[in-house]
């Protein structure tokens, strides 16, 4: 690719669109094909399902036992995804959508961080590397907390990078939110 072609690839929303397309291909392909195989994934799905059935979005349970081991946010996201998608509570793929979305957000955060600290090409390479890493692809297909934790961590690091580069009040406020 010529230098001009590379530069046009790195301008505007093209890098974000490319990374979004890559993530959609990697994270959404097969999301409904494989049933839950990880015991933790089944527990997260069941607890979110029970939350929807009971209408109690505060006291999380797995069967009869309270499930206070993980932050409640992932259960809320999974339950919201099932509700928004309008699927039967026993269909497993909507429970996985928050993980796929979180992995995508982490990729975009890494792109932005690389772009701010170095240049657009570094950001695109870093985002692509994260998007295609085996563990991220796997976690994007599983209804657990790992992808959401990755997104929260990379977003907070990106906000700190923004503060490092800009050193203004708005960047400070944004960084403090994370």
Describe the predicted segments one by one.
Residues 2-178:
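Membrane-integral, polyisoprenol-dependent glycosyltransferases
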